[in-house]
Structures are given as structure tokens and as C-alpha cells.
Design a protein with these regions (language model features):
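GIY-YIG nuclease catalytic motif and its immediate N-terminal context
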Residues: 1-74, 79-81
Length: 81
């Protein structure tokens, strides 16, 4: 099973980071109001970054790393992917 760390851009230009086994399905869930509370309040969202990782634990670690980054770094990550 594949695991992914992803980042979406919210309607308020903020970035939300999470992990999933299916990034496309997860973005649809966010946009349908079945995602995280933050994205329900600041949707719709657009997928801007996806990174495949080894397993669930690696996904959690990478998610935490990305969440610690500043907004400018997240903007650069989104622009490159």
C-alpha cells in the first residue's frame, strides 16, 4: 500500500498538510466538507504538493516536518511540484 504526504492550498491562501493513501480521494473529501475542520472552514482546496513516502510512520513524520515550515517555504514547495 502506498502512503502520501500532501499539501493543499485553501481559499484563504493558507496551506493545509496531511497524509493519505489516496491524495485525489482525500482532496475530494476536503472539498465535500468531509475533511479536516480547517479545510471545511477555509475551502475549497486545491492539491499543490504530493510526496510518496515509505509507510504510515514516515507519512506522519514528513507531515510534521512540513507543518513546521514557514509559509514562504510552502509556497516554494507548491511551485516546484
Amino acid at each position: 500500500m502506498a502512503f502520501f504526504c500532501y499539501m493543499v492550498k485553501c481559499a484563504n491562501d493558507a496551506y493545509y498538510t496531511g497524509w493519505t493513501t489516496d491524495p485525489i480521494r482525500r482532496v475530494k473529501e476536503h472539498n465535500a466538507g468531509r475533511g479536516a475542520r480547517y479545510t471545511r472552514m477555509h475551502g475549497p482546496v486545491e492539491l499543490v504538493y504530493v510526496e510518496e513516502v515509505e509507510d504510515h510512520i514516515a507519512a506522519l513524520k514528513r507531515e510534521a516536518e512540513i507543518k513546521k515550515l514557514g509559509h514562504a517555504r510552502k509556497v516554494r514547495m507548491a511551485a516546484v511540484s
